[in-house]
Structure formats: structure tokens, C-alpha cells
């Protein structure tokens, strides 16, 4: 990350989705990047830190200006997408600001509820700025509700930020998870003997 980007990512969300913002921020910052991947891609960071998320609803001109500064010093914008965030003016404003900064290709929609481009407005999860992109600008959303689960969605976000294929990162993630599980099984079996 260069000096221009104080934050690896900025999480934009509505207060109704705060638990998702908190979960995502924590899991990104504490994700252990597989060492084999770092060897294969030496340009990758060792950690995904810091990740910015604001814990309260936005109000006040000074606060908006401060958040725009944080947004402009972020490498990626992760938008927690739900019907609540689709209706939140400040979520849309943050997406618009990021696009205006020339970083529209670094927006990652993280879908937690609703449907992108829904026929029923009550089910729409994308804020207007994401719905109104041209066909060439359209962004693929990462849906946490898929049967693969939250861990799968987290790895998908990281793979997207790193510009590596999902399956490459997922295989290494699963290998590490199995290795840790086997270590815990070995430790538990020692205590059971």
C-alpha cells in the first residue's frame, strides 16, 4: 500500500448492517495470508490493514468531510449491500465519491440481504450509484448468503482485492484450515490419553 492509501479498504454500510461491517472488518484485518501465496505473489501485502468503518450514522458537515478524507485515502471500497443500504443517502454518496476519484474499479459489493437490480424496489440491495453503472462498468457482487457461507465470501473479497483467482486463494485457505484443525485434534488426543 502506498502513502496515498492510509486504509486498505473503507467499509460503507447502513447502521442496520453494522454487525456485517464489524464482522468483515475484523476478519479482513486478522486474515492470515498463506505464506505460499506471498511467495508466489511477492507484491501482495502481508496483512490487510487497516480497514476503516465508521460506527455511527453520518450527520454533520464536518463528519462528512472527515469521512470523505478517509474514503479518498482508501485503496478499496467495500459496500455492505442490503435494502437498508440501498436507501441510505450516505452509502450512495460514498460510492459516488469513490467513483469520482477514479476508483470505480475498486468497489466491492458485499451482498447481505436483498437482490441487485430487483424488480421490487423493497428488495433492491444496490445503492443508486451501483445500479446506474453502464454495462462496461458493472461490478460483480459477492453474496454472503450463498450455500458456501461466510468464509467463502470473505476469501472471495480478498481474492478480488488481491487480483488473484478465487480458487487459488481458496485452496490455500482450506489447506491452512485443515492443518490447524489437525493440530487441534492432535493436541486434544494428547490430553485424552
Language-model regions, residue ranges each:
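Short mixed-charge
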Residues: 30-51
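C-terminal interaction surface of TIR/SEFIR-family domains
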Residues: 1-29, 49-50, 55-73, 83-89, ...
Amino acid at each position: 500500500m502506498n502513502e496515498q492509501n492510509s486504509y486498505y479498504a473503507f467499509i460503507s454500510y447502513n447502521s442496520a448492517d453494522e454487525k456485517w461491517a464489524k464482522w468483515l472488518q475484523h476478519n479482513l484485518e486478522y486474515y492470515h495470508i498463506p505464506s505460499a501465496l506471498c511467495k508466489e505473489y511477492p507484491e501482495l501485502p502481508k496483512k490487510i490493514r487497516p480497514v476503516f468503518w465508521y460506527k455511527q450514522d453520518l450527520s454533520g458537515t464536518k463528519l462528512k468531510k472527515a469521512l470523505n478524507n478517509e474514503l479518498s485515502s482508501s485503496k478499496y471500497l467495500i459496500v455492505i449491500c442490503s435494502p437498508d443500504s440501498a436507501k441510505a443517502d450516505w452509502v450512495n454518496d460514498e460510492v459516488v465519491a469513490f467513483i469520482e476519484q477514479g476508483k470505480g474499479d475498486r468497489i466491492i459489493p458485499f451482498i447481505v440481504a436483498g437482490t441487485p437490480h430487483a424488480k421490487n424496489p423493497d428488495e433492491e440491495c444496490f445503492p443508486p450509484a451501483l445500479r446506474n453503472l453502464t454495462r462496461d462498468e458493472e461490478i460483480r457482487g459477492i453474496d454472503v448468503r450463498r450455500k458456501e457461507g461466510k468464509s467463502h465470501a470473505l476469501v472471495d473479497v480478498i481474492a478480488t482485492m488481491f487480483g488473484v483467482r478465487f480458487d487459488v486463494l481458496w485452496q490455500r485457505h482450506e489447506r491452512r484450515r485443515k492443518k490447524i484443525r489437525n493440530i487441534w485434534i492432535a493436541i486434544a488426543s494428547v490430553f485424552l490419553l
